[in-house]
Amino acid sequence: MLSAYYNDPFLADFCLGNIPLRLASRQSSLAVLQAHECLRKLQIFFPRLWGQIITTTTQGDLDQETPLCAVENTGFFTDDVDFLVQSGQCDLGIHSAKDLPENPKATVVSITASIDPRDILVFHEKYLSIPLPRRLRIGSSSVRRKELLSLLYPSAIITDIRGTIQTRLKLLEEKNFDAIVMANAAVSRLGLRLPCTKILPPPYHPLQGRLAITASRHIRSWRGLFLTCGITEDVEIMCFS
């Protein structure tokens, strides 16, 4: 079935390596790694396919003050990436799936399997050798995570924290917090080895650890390609279209 894509009038040039597949991404290290991950998945099936990753700064990257609960279900982290797709500067947009609003600017053509849905609590490494304080200072911006933390640590002081993984780890290291919450998928993708962690119990975000891929043209071709290659796990992507 893959041979059909070599004859597809739109996809053939990508599959044959005649032109680059241009992927839009946020600028963070994690976002760029996710774009490379998408590219590698396709290259398993189309070895001659090659790509260019074009990054942009999103509103969510520039605004480090607004609580995430105030921008839930908006394009805070996705609209600027999808603008590159809609304007024809890129062919596909690569997103963390849980950043998607209900009605994204571009059309979702694939949602991948999660590499790990779990949340982890990352403690300051000093707690490898000393007991945890009774009133933990925990950094988290997610309403869902805050509710869980309040049950697990009733005496904890839970404070908003924003920024890239590296920024949040720096805040932890500088002792602004005793612990911070992270997605284990992000830690894995970045190849981080964190010495003092605890896996939090469910519930987890249903899209955590998944990538969402968006397009603005040739939607049927892209959806067929990702589905045939086994890259799409969640076939109910029409709910985001």
Swiss-Prot record:
Keyword Transferase: yes
One GO term of the biological process aspect: heme biosynthetic process
Enzyme class: transferase
A Gene Ontology term for the protein's cellular component: cytoplasm
MF (Gene Ontology): hydroxymethylbilane synthase activity
Catalytic activity, as annotated: 4 porphobilinogen + H2O = hydroxymethylbilane + 4 NH4(+)
Highest rank taxon of the organism: Bacteria
Keywords for this protein: Porphyrin biosynthesis, Transferase
Enzyme nomenclature, EC number: 2.5.1.61
Functional pathway: Porphyrin-containing compound metabolism; protoporphyrin-IX biosynthesis; coproporphyrinogen-III from 5-aminolevulinate: step 2/4
Role, per record: Tetrapolymerization of the monopyrrole PBG into the hydroxymethylbilane pre-uroporphyrinogen in several discrete steps.
Family named by the database record: Belongs to the HMBS family.
Protein name per the record: Probable porphobilinogen deaminase
Species name: Chlamydia trachomatis serovar D (strain ATCC VR-885 / DSM 19411 / UW-3/Cx)
High-level lineage: Bacteria, Pseudomonadati, Chlamydiota, Chlamydiia, Chlamydiales
